[in-house]
């Protein structure tokens, strides 16, 4: 039960079922469920995320991180956090209920007009401007992580991989986010800063215009290789020049030349095309009508089992836990201990160090091979992809490359011994 220590002071002596009444389930992920609920004292509608910490042991740091970041935020553009309660191994996280669904939901009935897109992007930018002023990076900006209230207010959600800036940049080897929206410098594991969120915003802008991010027809692993290598995506089709220029500004491969969130709020696409957020209720109503007609019954996420229908027949929003690449515990930047906890944080999971063969064998060999290919006029693209595959494998399983090399050497030795034995018997 060591992994529960970090949550020891999450109101563990209070029974959350006495304080809150669970209503309809509005989302389900691998390790938790989200319910619409009522605060029994204030009668306010809330969202209740219930996570079984026994089943979610590998996600403990992400959960602590989300609680820590949300508890430090005070902005109308960030999902509000009200507190958390530990009952046995179940963690109840009480958050603001946003009944308008996600920006991804609003895309499902069909394309959005630019006025809607600009208005949503303006509110995301306000949230990013606040976060960046607090020296925080979201690191997973996408339509699924943008929630709306029933009145059309737009708020950023899902802070499980948010980072805290130290000095001006996050250190290398902090590889997090969702592949299609990930900035080139994050994939290359260079040092990066809040400009990584601006790249993700540019991809989200294309997602809002097209219904999906660029390269969505490709395998995510393939996309990780292509983003650093290819030219930045562009917004194609019959869209206004200011919209295309906005996307182009966000998707500069050199983060130094990407504008800040504050600067983008002054971009002509934002200043000319936006309306009040109450205008977005038209999209929410459109989505509810579309859903009431029987559309969208199946979950679009392989990792989510979404219960879109409320038990009383009311159309509720869909809350998802979308698949995201998380940082391994040894590379966590801002390890969030439980809020108000005076005890030691949860014991970190011991991780095997990264493979030594990466620096002593893999990189030198690939360096030699690429040099030979260049001299012969060949392309080094495939070699670069294979080399990157080693780095990606190490992120999910540190030490795997050393194990592979040991196994290969053993196989070569056995093969060599077998050949020598056959030669000597002839």
From Swiss-Prot:
Catalysed reactions, semicolon-separated: L-seryl-[protein] + ATP = O-phospho-L-seryl-[protein] + ADP + H(+); L-threonyl-[protein] + ATP = O-phospho-L-threonyl-[protein] + ADP + H(+)
GO cellular component: FAR/SIN/STRIPAK complex; Golgi apparatus
Entry-annotated residues carrying Phosphothreonine: 174
Taxonomy, superkingdom: Eukaryota
GO molecular-function terms, A-Z: ATP binding; metal ion binding; protein homodimerization activity; protein serine kinase activity; protein serine/threonine kinase activity
Pfam family, one: PDCD10_N
GO BP annotations listed: axonogenesis; establishment of Golgi localization; establishment or maintenance of cell polarity; Golgi localization; Golgi reassembly; intrinsic apoptotic signaling pathway in response to hydrogen peroxide; positive regulation of axonogenesis; positive regulation of stress-activated MAPK cascade
Phosphoserine carried by residues: 278
Entry-linked SUPFAM superfamilies: Protein kinase-like (PK-like) (SSF56112)
Regulation: Interaction with Golgi matrix protein GOLGA2 leads to autophosphorylation on Thr-174, possibly as a consequence of stabilization of dimer formation. The C-terminal non-catalytic region inhibits the kinase activity.
Function, in words: Oxidant stress-activated serine/threonine kinase that may play a role in the response to environmental stress. Targets to the Golgi apparatus where it appears to regulate protein transport events, cell adhesion, and polarity complexes important for cell migration. Part of the striatin-interacting phosphatase and kinase (STRIPAK) complexes. STRIPAK complexes have critical roles in protein (de)phosphorylation and are regulators of multiple signaling pathways including Hippo, MAPK, nuclear receptor and cytoskeleton remodeling.
Subunit structure: Homodimer. Interacts with CTTNBP2NL. Part of the core of STRIPAK complexes composed of PP2A catalytic and scaffolding subunits, the striatins (PP2A regulatory subunits), the striatin-associated proteins MOB4, STRIP1 and STRIP2, PDCD10 and members of the STE20 kinases, such as STK24 and STK26. Interacts with TAOK3 (via N-terminus); the interaction promotes STK25 abundance at the level of protein expression and/or stability.
Protein name per its UniProtKB record: Serine/threonine-protein kinase 25
Organism: Mus musculus
Gene transcribed to yield this protein: Stk25
